Structures are given as C-alpha cells and as structure tokens.
Amino acid sequence: MLLIFLGAAALARPAALQARVVVDETGRRVNVPDHPQRLVSLAPSITETLYALGLGDRLVGDTDYCDYPPQAKLKPHVGNVLNPSLEKIVALKPDLVLGIAEANRRQTADQLQRLGIPLYGLTDHTLDDTLRSIADLGRALDCNVAATALEQNLRRRVAEVERRVAGEARPKVLFVVWHQPLTTAGPHTFISDVIHRAGGVSISDDLKSEWPGLTLEAALDRDPDVILFPSHVELSPPLDEIKRLPGWREFRAVKQNRLYVVSESIIHPSPRLIDALEQVAAILHPEAFAMAASDEWRVASDEQQAPGFSSRREGFACSSLATRHLSLTATLTGLPPQQIEAAQ
C-alpha cells in the first residue's frame, strides 16, 4: 500500500530528464538522467564528494549524519543510512539518488527503482575505490572537468606520500576502530589501505574479516609499534585513560608512548581520506616529512588535531562499515544498537 501511495507521488514529479543507461560501481544498470539537477545523497562520504566537486547547489537532501561541510547540515534529511525514509526521498523529487553498496541496503535501491527513481551505487573498499568514485560521479553527473581536476590533485598527493615513504622500514600498526571490545580494520578496507600507503603494516591484514574483533592478548602477541585511534570522544577516550585500561599498559607502543589520535577523515571514504593519509604517513615517518614525532602530533581529545588538519568536531558518520558489525554500525550511524537490529 505504501509503495502504491509513493508511486503516485513519484508520478507527480516534473517530467523526467532525458536519460542514458550506465553501469554503476555495483554492476547495476541505471537510467541516469542527463545533467541531473536534484540529487539525494545516502552517505556522508558522497555528500562530501559532491561539495568537493562544486555540486552542493544540486544536493536537495542527505542523511541525518551528513555534517561536512557545515552547509550539508542545512539540507533536508531523509533519515539514517541503513533505513532512509522513502517518503522523504520521494517528496524531494530527486532526479538521481546516490548510495554506497556497503552501507545502504539493496532493498532501498529496489524500492526506489520500483518508484521510478534511479539509484547510482558506489563502492568504497580501498583508497583507489574512493578516487575512482570521483571520476565515476563526474561521468554520471556530467561534471567531468571538475572530477578530473579533483582526482588528479588527490592522486598527486598520494604519489608524493608514497614517494617519501618508499624504502623506509614499515612499522606495525594497530588501528583501533573500537576499544571495548577491541575492533580493528582488516584487509580490503580503505583504512588498511591508508596504513599501507602511509608506510606501515596493519597487524590485522592477515585476518579474513574486514572489521575483525581481537582479544587484547592477540593484539599484544602481534606487538604493534604504533597504535592509532580516530578522533571521536566515544571511540577514543583520552590517551592517558587508555593507558590505564587493564592490559593496555603491556603494549610496547604504550610503553614507548607511540599512541596517536588521528583525524576522523580516516574513516570517511571521501576526498578527505587523503588528509588522513598524509597525517598517518607523517606520524609513522616523521623524518620523511621533516617533523619530529613529538606531542604536537598527539591529540588529547577530538577538539584538537595535528597541525594542518581541521579542528572541527566531526561526527563519526557512515561508511562501508555499516552492515558488518553491530557495534561498529552504531558508531558509524549514531544509532543505538537496538534500533539498528530493528532496522535490519
């Protein structure tokens, strides 16, 4: 009954633009309008990319957790990432909806398709996926010039980082997505990719899960040289508090004071991911970036950032982690676990 009502509402939209069939990053064939003017984003990373491409004026709606840049918070919201409101999406009369396969449910795409609203899906497993998505969005949204310029600039920055860390010894890195229970980033994730390109080795790259849990004992056995936390008050209590947690003081990295809080851009598969790459590389290889690995790189709270990085309190919004791990999903979406379980 709901779909019938929404279908009637969808028919009331303005006459459809001329469209072309494209294959999105998930392999789906999508009827994408030529030069779409009304866009709805179902993921914060997509919202950030649209603004980076200069398309903020075309964005007519996004999710509750799209908070960067600040203008994104002023857009009409269509709900959370896992379970957006179809009614709100239809009411915005979008020409095209943009989503991420790993975060948005296939059911949402299918329902929108039945309503005649195309959804273009992206993927975000690696840093290269993030850069490729910029080019793909440029083609889908008819803004190739801006997309090419942005992608090339970001690739130059990546290449410069890789040039600086080439030949350097690779420290072992534990990235803490969640500290109780301990959850980290496994292989085939953009976080692991950032660590590798920054000249490190993730201690969890041999694990099968993309977002594996680790016992403290297992993490201690892997003996990381460096431990990284994202700058979020819930995920990253003050480092002094971490050091006092049972078992944590046994880490060699703790004894050597090599705990760092890094910018939350590391969990956003958007152009800002390159900011995180540069920061992590400078932490792991300060000599290659003419910086001392001193307390200026240690962030005591999410109100502070390393030099050259935003000091804004960013929401740990959403990424491909969403459907993989309940506690991680709660962190990414800001939803209580009970609500996530109900949505699933």
Predicted stretch roles:
Residues 1-10:
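Bacterial N-terminal signal peptides
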Residues 12-16, 293-328:
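Short, basic, low-complexity termini and linkers enriched in Ser/Thr/Gly/Pro
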Residues 20, 37-103, 108, 203, ...:
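A short, structured surface patch at a secondary-structure boundary
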Residues 22, 28-29, 96, 106-183, ...:
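Extracytoplasmic substrate-binding proteins
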Residues 43, 101-102, 177, 207, ...:
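Short secondary-structure boundary segments
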Residues 63, 188-211, 231, 260:
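His/Asp/Glu-enriched short active-site or ligand-binding loop at hydrolase and phosphoryl-transfer sites
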Residues 86-93, 115, 214-223:
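Short helices/loops that flank or line small-molecule/ion binding pockets
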Residues 103-114, 226-244:
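A ligand-binding cleft/hinge motif common to bilobed small-molecule-binding domains
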